[in-house]
Amino acid sequence: GTDGNSISSDWPKLAGQNQKYLYEQLQYFKDGVRMNALMMSVTPYLQTLDDEDLLDIAAFYSNYETSVGQAKNDEELLNIGTQLYRFGNMKKGIPACTSCHAVYGQGNSLAGFPAVAGQQIGYLTSTLKAYRSKERNTGELSEMMQSIAQNLSDDEIDALANYMHGLYQ
């Protein structure tokens, strides 16, 4: 949407996203480092913009308030998602998501960790799977996420996406 709150589950919500993270991702798309079928139509436009334009776009969307998501009321899904997000699973090499994305999913803007609270389920699912398959490979943060996501099953990814979609402060 025009306020950065996507109505499609496959498209990310940009509203309220950390400015540094948005800027970096726009730069990756512009430079052709990050590829995504949904962004193919926008990439040529991004290539006409300078750094100041990208910073302005990132600031624009980061200043909007993200809409609140509603997690599916599935007890097993919520239990798995809650456990992984808050505490991780050290036996599987999965640290708590709160370590980088914070308790309420607001991320860490100084470190460049994205906000995940209220993010679209479809987008979260496809992103975690892209990290797991190493299809998404832009920067050091991607390497960190790849090493975590490779240890997640499809069911755990679904549970995490559902849990994060329902996070709010």
Per-segment meaning from a language model:
Residues 1, 9, 39-42, 81-88:
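Sequence context of c-type cytochrome heme-c attachment sites
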Residues 70-91, 96-106:
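Extended amphipathic alpha-helical interaction segments
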Residues 1-4, 57, 94-103, 160, ...:
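The canonical Cys-X-X-Cys-His
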Residues 19, 86-98, 113, 117-126, ...:
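Sequence context surrounding c-type heme c attachment/ligation sites in exported
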Residues 7-14, 29-73, 109-115, 133-159, ...:
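Axial heme c-ligation environment in periplasmic c-type cytochrome domains
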